Structures are given as C-alpha cells and as structure tokens.
Amino acid sequence: MLLFAQPATRIVRLTIDDITRAADGQVFIRFGEPPTPVPEPFATLLLQATTQRDNLQTATNPGARWLFPGRRAGQPLHASHLSQLVRDLGVPALAGRTAALRQLVLQAPAPVVAQALGFTHGTTTRVASEAGTPWSRYASGDHSRWPQPE
C-alpha cells in the first residue's frame, strides 16, 4: 500500500500471477503496464507472501489465486479488513499512500508513474503539481508519434 501508493481496494485484488520474477531474479508486481520492479527487502517479503497465504486451509478456498484470499469462496480479503490490519500496525494508510505518491512523482514524470502504477494521468499530475515536482514541464503523451531525427 505504501511503497507504491496503492489503495487497499487494489491491493486485495492482486493475484499471485501479478507477482513475477525475471530470469535475473528481479521481482515485479503488476499494477499497470509495464510491471513495476520491487526493490529489496520488499521483493523478498512479497515472494514470501505468495507462498504463505492465509485462508487457504478452508474448504472454500483451497485453490484461490488471490494474493490475500478472503474467507468467502472465490473472494479476496475485504479491503476494509486489510486497512484495519495496517492501522493496527500503527500506519496511517491514507496519509502514507499520499506521501508515497508524492515521493514517486518527485522521482519520475507523473504520466510515467500513472501508467506504471495504474493511476489516471490527472491524479498523478495534480499530486505532482502540489508537490512542486521538477517534472512539471514534462511533455506527457505518446512521444513515438514525433518524427525521429535522421
């Protein structure tokens, strides 16, 4: 939630198929296209989460593909339950997500962050503007349309 500024509703919809490992060992998570690289130590924790999932011992979920399976058949963990678990750890989820998104748009152009993490361009551009990003003059859009120098 905090590392990639994702809401709990999007996190609980992740499946184990959204977590991949490249031949070189780099771990990726798919929120948008292309998949986003996950830095250590979070990559190791994420891989552990794919193999040590809760609620798989119930009769309703033995083959669940959800990264966070819920107790109901075919359903992921409820987003409010995940949010409560995070709050119980002392982490204010909304404030943390906002801070994470601000940090991300300070490191990369807002349209790049939007595409990689599944946000709208408007959301990341607004957050970038509020954060005083150095990328505020970045020309978003499809740059492949422009003629290439010869």
Label each PLM-derived region with a short phrase.
Residues T124-V127:
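Helix-turn-helix DNA-binding helix
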Residues M1-L3, T9-I11, F28, L46-A49, ...:
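Short, structured motif recognition centered on aromatic/hydrophobic residues
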